[in-house]
């Protein structure tokens, strides 16, 4: 797994159920996001088209919250699409080309996050296939045609899409080029690595599908939901010290998240501190060493569910050298999130942040009670 490119991160592959404590935290989340401001007329009104916080699904239901009042696509549109360059490094600027989209009757998003955006924009009925990371209920009946950004051109073209959505990690490049040569419009958008970067992504997807106003409305609604989450979360930065571990035990992959992992942005929203960032790790992922893990002394370990299962659950995790010698390992303080959700930076990110904040607060209260 290459670590040289500081803008690449590992991705999860298959959906798994979250732990029971996290689901309980998610139930509290729905109430937090649905709550209205208390007090007199000083609270701003929610945006009319971006409204709908009261209808947010319980996170444990694994459903999306579609926008209300979405419009019909206005086509054709000509949009910018990233040019995939296998030789580009993280410091090189992206190149763009123009792509015309004139039919969105058969949409094929090649990542879970892009699928979430399309469904939330009200165009889910037009989607003909999904990436394995599109684990939400509305997409469950669709055929899986890509896994962890690895696509098969034959599988994609067999679905006869009229437009394909991808991002800068979609590959292999040979497959993408084969799809592009077929004549099907392929719109490639930038990845989102932080909260702020996800809003332009919403709008880029909406523009490509001929519904730019709905993209703006989705950004507006998600910003409002994030503001509510921040009010509920402890944003002081004095929260627990959390180490994000990317684990694939069957492949011998054990990585510690640092700056740019995506988890650092989510943790910052909860008020927690990222152990890798505090250690000075300036790349998204670094191989775990016993000494570094012990020196980090995290209070909580954050992992993806499939990764946790790949090392034998919590029992296997604490057997990894150095883990048991940390406060998190000694207390078995482990939070696991479904692979296709934690780092998606999509319409459900406010739910992710709120659920994680609740879970970390529970661990912190438990630790202070000892």
Description of each model-found segment:
Residues 257-284:
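His/Asp/Glu-enriched short active-site or ligand-binding loop at hydrolase and phosphoryl-transfer sites
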Residues 2-27, 34-110, 213-243, 361-370:
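Bacterial Sec-exported substrate-binding components of ABC uptake systems
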Residues 86-89, 97-98, 115-120, 135-139, ...:
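Short, solvent-exposed loop/turn elements at domain surfaces
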Residues 68-88, 105-159, 163-168, 275:
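A short, structured surface patch at a secondary-structure boundary
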Residues 197, 203-207, 300-370:
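Structured C-terminal subdomain patch of bacterial secreted/periplasmic proteins
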Residues 76, 101-104, 111-118, 124-125, ...:
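Extracytoplasmic/secreted envelope proteins and their assembly/folding machinery
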Residues 104, 152-169, 184, 289-303:
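Proline-aspartate-enriched helix->loop->beta-strand connector
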Residues 172-174, 187-204, 237-265, 309-312:
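Extracytoplasmic ligand-binding site segments that recognize negatively charged/polar headgroups
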